[in-house]
């Protein structure tokens, strides 16, 4: 055994696969409690098949099959995985915090069991102002305004360090962030009144999500 290197198994896929059409398989693999790692590139849309809405798409987002803006919030894949209690789970955004991304990957690799890392991944379907050259900056904005949260759940960590919330409290500018991407801003031109309602629901859901993550910090800290 001393001459055999440890196998490192990583599976990479998009949100359409992990959240939606391949979710049953992803869930089955994670539930087996084997030493396998899954990295999901979360673009919040079916990027490779024409831009259809997926269960990772967010409230008010315009996509195929959601031309008037998606009405319901996105699925919480991370928390579904966390509910097992023995899966390493992290959400990352490289443009916002490269060190946190590397740390999550390192921890997942070192963890003796299944792991799931979900990375925020801007894509052409988002139609970011200035184009994809701004995708790293867009990740940072997403985290700063509270649209995307970064955290790490490590079942093997000591008490008080099992759940680490790496995101700071939202700094504002949420609606401005949405308007910087045509996947949202186009709704204001086509259905302005509906856009106002859905975008506010999107922001409210983000606030609730952050408050929930704070409660998870307290819960795993034993407070």
Feature map (PLM): residue ranges:
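Short C-terminal domain-edge/linker segments immediately following a structured domain
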Residues: 41-45, 68-72, 121, 146-153, ...
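Structural signal for hydrophobic packing residues in well-ordered secondary-structure cores
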Residues: 30-34, 44, 82-88, 105, ...
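Conserved thiamine diphosphate
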Residues: 3-5, 57-111, 179-186, 192
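Acidic, Ser/Thr-rich peripheral helices and adjacent loops at domain boundaries
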Residues: 53-75, 133-153
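Glycine/aspartate-rich loop-and-adjacent alpha/beta segment that forms the canonical ThDP
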Residues: 101-197, 201, 211-215
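Thiamine diphosphate
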Residues: 1-52, 89, 95-112, 186, 193-197, ...
């Amino acid at each position: 055994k001393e001459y055999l290197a440890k196998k490192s198994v990583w599976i990479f896929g998009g949100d359409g696969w992990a959240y939606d059409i391949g979710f049953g398989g992803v869930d089955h693999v994670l539930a087996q409690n084997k030493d396998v790692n899954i990295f999901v590139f979360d673009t919040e849309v079916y990027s490779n098949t024409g831009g259809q809405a997926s269960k990772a798409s967010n409230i008010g987002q315009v996509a195929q099959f959601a031309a008037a803006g998606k009405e319901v919030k996105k699925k919480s894949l991370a928390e579904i995985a966390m509910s097992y209690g023995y899966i390493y789970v992290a959400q990352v955004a490289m443009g916002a915090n490269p060190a946190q991304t590397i740390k999550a990957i390192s921890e997942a690799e070192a963890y003796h069991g299944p792991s799931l890392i979900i990375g925020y991944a801007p894509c052409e379907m988002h139609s970011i102002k200035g184009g994809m050259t701004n995708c790293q900056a867009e990740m940072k904005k997403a985290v700063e305004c509270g649209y995307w949260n970064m955290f790490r759940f490590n079942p093997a960590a000591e008490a008080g360090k099992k759940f680490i919330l790496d995101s700071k409290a939202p700094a504002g500018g949420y609606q401005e962030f949405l308007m910087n991407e045509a996947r949202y801003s186009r709704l204001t031109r086509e259905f302005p009144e509906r856009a106002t309602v859905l975008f506010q629901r999107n922001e409210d859901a983000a606030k609730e999500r952050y408050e929930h993550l704070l409660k998870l910090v307290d819960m795993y800290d034993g407070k």
